[in-house]
Swiss-Prot record:
Protein name from the UniProt record: UPF0473 protein LAF_0524
PANTHER family referenced in this protein's UniProt entry, alphabetically: UPF0473 PROTEIN CBO2561/CLC_2432, UPF0473 PROTEIN CBO2561_CLC_2432
Family: Belongs to the UPF0473 family.
Stored NCBIfam families: PRK13678.1-4
Signal peptide: none
Amino acid sequence: MSEQTPRDDGEIFTLVDEAGNEELYKEAMRFQSPETGKWYICLYPLDEENDEEVGIQAFAFEEPTSEEDELELLPIENDAEWEMVQEVLNTFIDDDGNFNA
């Protein structure tokens, strides 16, 4: 069953860049595409949480099969997926640029 209403579990993720630096990110939202059934998650840097603008990172992922499994973030594979994620994200940004999930 597709979940069309995004949800925010408020999870904190540690992302590691190419130089090996760790940065904490907070979940903005996750949703499942009704067309493909794939799951997506949008994250922002935790240290930008109270800033007027934050940089959003988006990833695909597969739902873990058990609570012990960690969520594995996957790169978004093509332009069509990026456009779909951007469209969903834009539906939750108001005219003032505030995110309202």
